[in-house]
């Protein structure tokens, strides 16, 4: 399915561009963390002075899940991590890893 690295990078950029539009209003950073022919993991992260929680975190997660379902139309697994980052101006961050069964959609993007 992936005949070369350039093609895979193009697909990753396209997914990131679409995902950023869903999250940019709340200041979240989005990247494709991992991509295989079977799945894509979206890494969604936000740094802040306090742990990210409540409505802001839920809104970003809802946007990510909605995007993944709309884009790929399949199941979504979500992991959430909160951890303190020492010696930084933004000592807390939250990361959502949204893994989607992307075989059909990735094949379309690769074509």
Predicted regions and their residues:
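C-terminal edge-of-domain segments
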Residues: 84-107
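Short glycine-rich, basic-tinged beta-strand/loop micro-motifs
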Residues: 29-55
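Short, ordered beta-strand-loop transition motifs
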Residues: 33-41, 81-92
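Assembly/interface hotspot detector across virion components, adhesins/toxins, and nucleic-acid enzymes
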Residues: 28-33, 75-84, 97-98
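Short, intrinsically disordered, low-complexity terminal segments
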Residues: 6, 19, 28-30, 54, ...
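N-terminal leader/targeting segments
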Residues: 1-37, 58
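Short, hydrophobic/π-rich interface segment
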Residues: 50-84
């Amino acid at each position: 399915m992936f005949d070369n690295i350039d093609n895979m990078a193009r697909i990753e950029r396209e997914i990131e561009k679409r995902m950023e539009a869903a999250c940019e209003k709340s200041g979240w950073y989005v990247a494709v963390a991992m991509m295989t022919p079977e799945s894509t993991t979206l890494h969604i992260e936000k740094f802040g002075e306090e742990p990210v929680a409540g409505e802001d975190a839920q809104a970003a997660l809802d946007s990510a899940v909605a995007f993944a379902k709309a884009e790929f139309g399949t199941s979504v697994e979500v992991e959430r991590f909160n951890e303190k980052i020492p010696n930084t101006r933004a000592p807390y961050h939250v990361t959502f890893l949204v893994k989607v069964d992307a075989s059909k959609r990735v094949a379309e993007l690769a074509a």
